[in-house]
Amino acid sequence: MAHRVDHEYDYLFKIVLIGDSGVGKSNILSRFTRNEFCLESKSTIGVEFATRTLQVEGKTVKAQIWDTAGQERYRAITSAYYRGAVGALLVYDITKRQTFDNVQRWLRELRDHADSNIVIMMAGNKSDLNHLRAVSEDDGGALSEKEGLSFLETSALEATNIEKAFQTILTEIYHIVSKKALAAQEATAGASVPGQGTTINVADTSGNTKKGCCST
């Protein structure tokens, strides 16, 4: 969703995390929204989401990040999970070649179910485990270039490029929404920012709270 309000934040953007189970999606979520990392995190069951409010080019943006289980038995939630998403972080594990080989399957699913204008970034996670690397950074870069995606290698453990990944996605979404708003205003004087998808009202969660396991 790309939804505009006038009070606590200017925009609410829904971003989905996708990729195989075990690639570190939940720790990316907790690192970005709560600055936490849990070494013994268990596989996600169903869907979780968390929020964080931050500044993007002078605007207050509330990022609503959704995390889903990677296991096939949870694929029934697919259409609802993608509905209204304006950004996606597609994650693979640099130490597990199979998770990289499955990236294109995840891309097909995303493009089948999500809005055609969705902003997608590919992230090679667990860059702190370079000694166990099974996917080169060049391979990741080549695939992302072929598919027209942004690309970074990340480490939720060391907090490497997590902030940059989400800032990049949110900034690109903001640019798209701003262009649509400008076009709408030119077409219809006084038109407001067009909504995308379904707006879901959720309770605000402070992104600055540090609690639970392995707080930093």
Curated annotation (Swiss-Prot):
A lipid is attached at C213, C214 (S-geranylgeranyl cysteine). It comes from Lotus japonicus (Lotus corniculatus var. japonicus). This is Ras-related protein Rab11C. Keywords: Cell membrane, GTP-binding, Lipoprotein, Membrane, Nucleotide-binding, Prenylation. GO terms for molecular function: GTP binding; GTPase activity. It is found in: Cell membrane. InterPro entries: P-loop_NTPase, Rab_GTPases_membrane_traffic, Small_GTP-bd, Small_GTPase. It holds the Pfam family Ras. Gene3D superfamilies: P-loop containing nucleotide triphosphate hydrolases (3.40.50.300). GO terms for cellular component: plasma membrane. It is a lipid-anchor. A motif (Effector region) lies at residues 41-49. GTP binds at residues 19-26, 67-71, 125-128. Belongs to the small GTPase superfamily. Rab family.
